Amino acid sequence: MDYNFRGNHYGPRNLTRKEHKKMSNAGFSAPVNYWGAIDGLTPKSSNDGKTSSVAEAPNEYGDTAAHDVYGEVLAPSTEYAVTDEVDLADIVLGSIHSRTIGSGASAITKKIMLTTVAITTQANNPPTVTISGVEVESGATAKRTYALAGTLTPRSKAQDVCGAFTASANFTQINTNAAVDPHVQTVGGVPVASDASHGRIEVQATMTDPTGNGAITAANAGGFTVTASPAETDPDANYITRAATATKYLIGTEAE
């Protein structure tokens, strides 16, 4: 610890903000922001999701006499803290991103497709966003993309960010999952072509009835359809809760 001379004795010196930050982060890993800068989102953690394929040659007993590992690919994800308002239009399903993996002579640039956005919001907890995708061919460009709409705030409350429900009860948790199905063709385990389809948004909500009269409903809103009607739970010595799911299917836009 550093010391400053104070009057007739030495005492501990308060660290500057910069010094404190440097000490608190010493040895910590830095999350990888696979999906580029998005206003209102700060990377919190990441995972490269690497997988490989294994070819096996059995002998007459069925034992593996030889094997080889090939076709390592990424399926990366980044979890974000919400630090300001987020315009969901800044997150595009099916979009293609370039990321350099490694450094120096071993550095390699990979192309990845954004396939999934998972938003978790609930009472008394700050929201989180996780964006995931898959590796595609080295020369990939976006072919079909799917737009999102809505605003997410950093407030610690349940948020129907896509406007999926009209409800007569209090939301306590809402999870929003938007996704496309990636289609990646490989040769020898290496991606050589890709596309995306079947864009959709699924919103799962939990509601409570503070009056205890069971009048809990969820209705279609914002182009969504209630695909799982509110399922009622009647706990002992507590209020009624219901969980509902609403789904919206998206029409993609062809790249020009």
Task: Please report, for each region that a protein language model flagged, where it lies by residue.
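Hydrophilic extracytoplasmic domains
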Residues: 236-245, 249-256
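Extracellular Ig-like/FN3 beta-sandwich strand-entry sites
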Residues: 94-96, 200
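Solvent-exposed edge beta-strands and adjacent loop segments
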Residues: 18, 23-82, 104-134, 143-211, ...
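Short, conserved charged micro-motifs
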Residues: 85-92, 211-218
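Hydrophobic lipid-interacting interfaces of membrane-associated proteins
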Residues: 134-141, 247-253
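Short, cysteine-centered beta-strand-loop-beta hairpins and adjacent loop/turn segments enriched
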Residues: 85, 139-141, 212-213, 254
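Short, Lys/Arg-enriched N-terminal segments with co-localized hydrophobic residues
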Residues: 2-22
